[in-house]
Amino acid sequence: MHYSTSPLGEAGRTGEMQFIEMMQAGVLVSMSIDNVTAERCDCFACMHMLQTVNKHRTGGKFKLTTKKLVEMATIDGARDLGFDKVTGSLTPGKRADIILVRTRSPHMGSDGDAYDALVQLAQPSDVALVMVDGRILHRNGEFTALDYDKLLADGAQSVAALKAKAKWS
């Protein structure tokens, strides 16, 4: 059995997320983002929110490690979707799906624990590189594999067409 939690959306809508009980019962719990129009598309914030919700809900009785939170956002998500044979971990033979995160900034701290830094301190602006299947798609704040201006123009054109079709101004 699998369950994907969307912490940023669920925390504001449904009250208590009982994912700890699910994990204890053997359910594979992964992390997701439900709706990019209603919440931030920020995996770091999702991990941090899940950690915070867990601390408040369980009073710290169930320690959800930052390593486990990163696994929930990576390999557990791939397992949940049935993609774990091709992605979700850095393993020979799998696709090279990688993000590189800048750690040399004042807000990232200096204690040296990579999992703690990713979950508790990292922000989307810290992502220096995104590689999907070995192709660099984003580097230093710039998309490298798509025409961003064309994407925005196509999106605006689609919205205008939908509004016209719906007779909505």
What feature does the model see in each segment?
Residues 2-6, 32-34:
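A cross-family glycoside hydrolase active-site/sugar-binding cleft signature
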Residues 3-4, 50-52, 133:
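Generic beta-structure capping elements
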Residues 5-8, 78:
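A generic structural signal for short
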Residues 10-13:
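Helical hairpin unit composed of two closely spaced alpha helices linked by a short loop
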Residues 18-106, 121-123:
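His/Asp/Glu-enriched, well-ordered alpha-helical/loop segment
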Residues 71-169:
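Active-site microenvironment of metallo-dependent hydrolases
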